[in-house]
Amino acid sequence: IFLLWGWILTGAGISNFIILRVLRSKEAFDLMGPYSLGNWALFLLVGFIFMFILLRKLNRERKVYSHLDSYFNKLWQVTVAAFFVGTFICIRLGIIPPPIMLLIAGLATTVSGLFIRFKPLVIGGISFFLFSMAATFINNEYIALLTSAAIVCGYLIPGYFLKSAKEQQNV
């Protein structure tokens, strides 16, 4: 799941940067907000569709459902709710969402890593905290690239370490 969302969100961040650069070059400043929101919404929709398909497949193959599985499902469901509420609050207050979104991602990722005692995931979660603070100092023009870098460090790198650890366990 970390790899799925890592790639989806990295793609969203990079495409958002490109969209904003193109709109800025055409001085279409009034379109930046709606296009940015639409870009993120499209990528999230695609991500949720892929996740739904992946989870259905995994649940069909699963023989045992543990309390740990239940805990992680609840943790990430609450995290998704926090993302939506945080985005709504940011839009209402007229501030950019990435610092808050990265903070929320850092919390859930760090807790996940601590719970399964997987150091790369803990480090990935902590990197989200650092990127969250850095996002408050970055020009809005580059915030999408910073967000993509945060996702690579927080989801993709730990996700590949986790995948490798799982494969070594199954050998």
Give the positions of each predicted feature.
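Selected alpha-helical membrane-embedding segments in polytopic membrane proteins
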Residues: 1-84, 88
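Structural signature of hydrophobic alpha-helical transmembrane segments
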Residues: 35-45, 88-103, 148-149
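Membrane-proximal helix-loop-helix units in multi-pass membrane proteins
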Residues: 64-121
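Hydrophobic core segments of alpha-helical transmembrane domains
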Residues: 9-16, 41-55, 105-113, 150-168
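Terminal transmembrane helical module of multi-pass membrane proteins
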Residues: 108-171
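Hydrophobic alpha-helical transmembrane segments and adjacent interfacial helices
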Residues: 13-19, 80-90, 110, 127-140
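Membrane-helix interface and helix-disruption motif detector
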Residues: 26-31, 89-97, 139-146
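Membrane-embedded alpha-helical segments of small multi-pass membrane proteins
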Residues: 38, 48-52, 100, 111, ...
